[in-house]
Design a protein with these regions (language model features):
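Carbohydrate-active catalytic/glycan-binding domains of CAZyme proteins
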Residues: 1-141
């Protein structure tokens, strides 16, 4: 987990005997770097091998995904090896970043994003917030 004040840089291990609560911070600092500290999804289990997806935040939030192979994990140690980095194609619609990858059975979900410049965005947001209830009534009818 990354702490709120770590700016996506410090990744620590937390341990518990219960999956739902009672986690304690381990003294192990897994990584202290904007490249690969912030998680990009759940751990993946493929052919008895564990992989950890992480974000590349060197140039900003979630510019790409790094996949690490977990070599060793215990209460006292953690070791991983980089397998591959994934970045969006500059000509794709979501060209500004990839920040999530998850698998479930035969389904893979990858989340990307594109920053759009919207002229007068602040004015639009203020008007929308001011008249939100009125607009909602129009949409219902």
């Amino acid at each position: 987990a990354t702490s709120r004040n770590a700016y996506n840089k410090d990744l620590y291990m937390w341990t518990s005997n219960n999956r739902l609560y009672g986690y304690d911070l381990s003294p192990i600092l897994i990584k202290s770097n904007l490249f690969g500290s912030r998680m990009a999804g759940d751990f993946m289990y493929v052919n008895n091998t564990v992989y950890r997806p992480a974000q590349d935040c060197l140039q900003g939030y979630g510019k790409g995904i790094i996949l690490y192979k977990v070599e060793d994990i215990s209460d006292k140690s953690y070791n991983e090896t980089k397998v591959i980095s994934l970045y969006p194609d500059s000509s794709s619609y979501y060209s500004d970043g990839l920040h999530t990858i998850n698998f479930y059975k035969s389904i893979c979900v990858i989340d990307g994003y594109k920053n759009h410049y919207i002229p007068f965005q602040k004015i639009y947001r203020k008007l929308f917030d001011k008249y939100r209830s009125w607009i909602s009534c129009l949409l219902v009818y």
